[in-house]
Amino acid sequence: MAEQLVGPECEQAVELLRALQREMDARYRELLALGLRKVRREDGLALHLVVVDELAFYLSDSDRKLRQEVAELLRDLVARGRAAGVIVVAATQKPGADVPTALRDLFGFRLALRCNTPQASDTILGQGWASSGYDASTVAGGQRGVGLLLAEGERPARIKTFHLSDAQIGAIVERAGARRADAWLAATGSEG
């Protein structure tokens, strides 16, 4: 369940990203005071998972200044967020010049599902992988969920993810929401 959902309003996205940046900075101050380098499970700080679905949409807004701020905020969150418990996951259907290299290169894990061209595959995985035999454009069109995963400096590995229908996703969301509500009720002593 999302704590906050941002639709197609770039201004809302910027506000949320600024708030996450402030939270990240506060956590770094707390970590510094405790003499720690990163958030640990035993610290009791919840992870913030930031999912940006269709990254290119927010990076191609007609307002150049807004576009630039989204890119800068995301770059900071991706670069510094993980140690503070702020994890960014970004997806785009058509990788290209809309996603700045300075942002794209910060992602430690990259998954290239079937692409139309070797250049698109390289845009995701990094320059030169397609010519080295790691080309997501060679994945057959009927192989849903098959792609190449590049994980923190390793060679890309061919993987298969699960493909879920909208109905299956809805059932998972409903079940997870109910479990989260049950846990909250138990923790607060409230009754449903």
Indicate where each model-derived feature is located:
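Flexible gly/pro/ser-rich segments immediately N-terminal to CXXCH heme-c attachment motifs
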Residues: 41
